[in-house]
Amino acid sequence: MSTAAPAASATNSAIPAQKEFSLPPSTDTVSVPVNRKKQKRRQKQAARLAAERQSNGHISPDAATQNGSSPAADPEGYHSDEFGDVDQEQLSNGDANHKDDQDSVDAHDDYQYPGNGSEGLQKPTGRKSKKKKGKKGPNGTHAPEDETATHASTPSVSMSHPLPPTLPSHLGPRPILKPAKTRSIWNTSTQEERENIKTFWLELGEEERRQLVKVEKDAVLKKMKEQQRHSCSCTVCGRKRTAIEEELEVLYDAYYEELEQYANHNQGSFEKGPPIVPPPRLYQPPLRSPGQHTRTQGQFHPSRGRIHEVPEEEDDDDLEEDYDEDEEDDEPYSDEDSDDEDDEARAARADFFAFGNSLTVKDGILTVADDLLKNDGKHFIDMMEQLAERRMQREEDTQYGIAAAHQSLHSGHNHGPFDEEDYDEEEDEDYDSQEDEDYEEDEMDTMTEEQRMEEGRRMFQIFAARMFEQRVLTAYREKVAEQRQQKLIEELLEEETRNEQRNAKKAREAQKRKDKKKLQKQAKEEERARREAEKAAEEAAAKAEQEKKLEEQRKKREEQRKKKEADRKAQEEERARKEAEKLRRQREERERQAEVERKQREEKKRREEARRKEKEERELREKKAKEEQLQKDAAKAEEAAKEREKREYQAKRTSPFSSNQHPQISSSPVAHSPHIQSGIPVVPKAPTPARPRQPSQQDSHTSSPHSQPASTDPSQASVSPRSMPISQSSGASSVASKHVHGLHAMFHQPQPSAPLSPLGRSIPPGFSAMNGLPPGPPGLTGILGRPPMAHELPVYPPHSGPFIGQFRGYPTPNGIPAAPGINGARAMPPGRGFPLESAHGFPFHGQQQIPGAFSAQQSGLPHGHSRQPSGSFERSPLEGQTQPMPISRPSPIKRPSSTQQDQRKNGDRTAQRDVDDLSAHLGSSALLDDTDVPFASTLSQSLPGATAPGPLPGPARASFGGPSLFPDPLSTSGWSNNAFGSGVHHRAHTSRPVAIRLLVIQACKQLNTMSPFKGADGFHDVSLVLRQVEQLRPQNEPSISLKEMLDICDTEGSTQNGGGSFSTKKDETGEFVKFEPDNNSAASGHRGSIVPGEIGSPVPSSSLPAFGGIGTPSVLRQFSSPPMGF
């Protein structure tokens, strides 16, 4: 069976009603066999209703049968019962368990219809009459309002009968809805919901009602077939269900054809059966009184509980129950609705078995006759209530039948037990089969085709009524939902309006507060402006007072400045006067010096002339004396050699350490000529005792050459060995005298001025020969043995222990002085495998004697002043060290004073020159002018406790054993071999920036000296200066970058970093730098002002620094610290 009904019609089936037709037309005519039980029950019910109608004054059953009028039902009762209960079930608990047929039977016994204000009358007594409850009310007639309810569908309608009386006023329709202001759509009670449903139906128009009760054919058939989904699917049940569906289709099609014929011809009948309208007897019982409570179910049941039912009716029960289960969630329609009702019975309920007459089919749509929809639809509502009662009565009959057949329910089937409230096709089949067995003899052919068609029509009528009921309820609830939605929207709009009003109020209040704050702020601004104006006035007054004070102070400062300016001008004038006086003195001094030099030159010419004459005479005398002296000297030499060998032999046997303290011979630091002079014979004289020197001659700063007449005595002048003749033709006498003088001078303490000849000098007693070698040949006692060669070991190995260096006396190897009496021989630097060279063909090796062995002044100690000590002895040519002295103005070139006559002649000049030297070297700072800047002190003056230099030099190339101009590069000695002082060892403690600045200053000075032309402005290329600085930089120092040098040039000069300032300039050729000295620069000192290459500058030192590297430059020595050891 196909279903093609619209969805709206399928879902809006909402009309509760049931209708069943009874086939027997009357008790008189029994044409076909029927179900006797149902027939008896229906007959009894019809008789009861007819009696009730007659007792209440209604029309007779015959009249009712003739006209077939449909009495009106109470619309309140319908809504109070069916719709109200359904809605209560949905809204309150949602319980849709409407399958309990037994409960439905019990509940139906005491079912009452409240809401009409009448008491229900008790039903006739029956099996369950004791459960009935009812209320008695006033009696009254209940006449149908519309007697034409079945005019169009009943063929035996008589239009001549009068209309039944109208309903009383208390039974008429009354408004149930409360006023809109008092009622609520959100929370409604059950009674209010029932009233609202009833009012909703009454408010609908005729067209709207017609649209609600329209049901499509396919929708009804679809609903019927859907009831079979939950039944058993076994073979037996499947076959049974298939047969039932086929029969349902046949019945449905036949029913629809009959309805269509009836709609077209206003009447119709089956070809072989009774007409579609039920027999008139069903309409004979009059309507009950309003207060009567009718029991619609049959009062009698078979003694064994077996009821013979046709399969269609049983299948209708199952379909009806299943349909209720499907609609359980959405639109529950339960038989238990009657269980929840109170005892108030509904009055005036008609027996609407003529519902089938009102069903029509138009264009395939099942609908209700128009007369049921007119007159506010009251007839339709009453008819639906009556159909519902018929449905419950039929369910009760089915319940008893199933209970009787329950014993053999599962005899040939494997199904589980079924609940009392659930029945399917198998139960009906078993029930039917058992009924067939029980009534096999007399009821085998009770069901005819007409009966089956009648039952089918009744089943379809029930379905249609229920679908109508559902549609009405659904439409009501849609309306309620729409009302609630609209109410919600209105409430939301009201809430939004209230919020907007509240926000507007808040905005107004905020604006008021803002305006108030603005006024307060404006008042505060005015107050602040007033205070600021007062404060500005006070500040202006204070400022005026302050300006007045500042003006006074400015005037005072101006006066002070003018006063200071006048004082400065006076000082400048005084300084200019002193400068002019100074220049005048200097000019006079230069004139006087020029006069003295002129006189000296004249004196020199006279002295040279006299010396030449004296020389000629002396040569003649010496020539004669030499021959005699040679013979004597040879004999004395042999004699002396034997005695010396004897003494040496004895000295070797005794201890070499002698406790005798040898007198030290002081040497004079008078400069000598570096050139080899021709030998001039000196007449030997007896040594005269010399006056001992006073300590003031060395330590006093205020002494002058005039206070030392002995220093200029010609008898105390030392004889330089370079001025002596080397030839052996001078005679033995002179040699012998020299030897005697040498020995006598060594041990004669009061006569330190006796010269020691380097040729006749012998080893003192108690001292062994140098390096353990025997002394030289006779006549050459002063010549030491050869130095050790490369394969020989020196007397003291290099780097010997420093413990003996604490004693005074002869220095040991590496410059450490040893105790008196210890052999002072010094070892030669190891690894030197070649002999020393001599200068100018002299057959003497360069082994140096011990310098200053008998010196009166300990070398290395600082002098009291930088002036040259006045001594009568010249320094020995064999000494490797000269006394450190400051470099002064170079003296005029003159002949060396090698003879006593020259010294005697030049005595006055020497005294005058000493005065000049004193003025250049000495003098107190108090005698200087205010503008004079005192000389920077030298190292020996500024650093107290300066010690002696390092070790004595080793063998070096020299002429006549003297120091050479350029020392041996292999020498590790710290003693300088030049004639301009020694390279003093001082560990540099200056910082790197200061050292770099000093190197840059020295490089600039050297570049100034080496300038190729006179017109140089003093600017030098920075790359050239950097190259020169790199040459001067010690090797153990890191390299200097150009940027670092330029950064150092930007520093300000001071006494620590060399003073002066640097000027830089840039052009297209490059960048140039220039050094400009000032009073703090090294140029103001007498030692630091000498740049290598200038006149009087010393030869660069070859000594090594204390901790390695190349010798420290002379400029850096001024700012170095004393050594930390020795």
Swiss-Prot record:
Keywords: Coiled coil, Cytoplasm, Stress response. One of its GO terms (cellular component) is cytoplasm. The keyword Cytoplasm applies. InterPro entries: Fungal_stress_NST1, NST1. Residues 479-655 form a coiled coil. Residues 311-344, 419-448 have a biased composition (Acidic residues). Residues 1-17, 727-737, 886-898 have a biased composition (Low complexity). Residues 35-45, 125-136 have a biased composition (Basic residues). Residues 1-192, 266-348, 404-453, 492-774, 823-914, 939-965, 1075-1126 are annotated as: Disordered. Residues 291-300, 655-670, 694-721, 846-860, 867-885, 1115-1126 have a biased composition (Polar residues). It is found in: Cytoplasm. Residues 96-111, 492-512, 522-651, 902-914 have a biased composition (Basic and acidic residues). Its main location: cytoplasm. It holds the Pfam family NST1. May act as a negative regulator of salt tolerance. Belongs to the NST1 family. This is Stress response protein nst1.
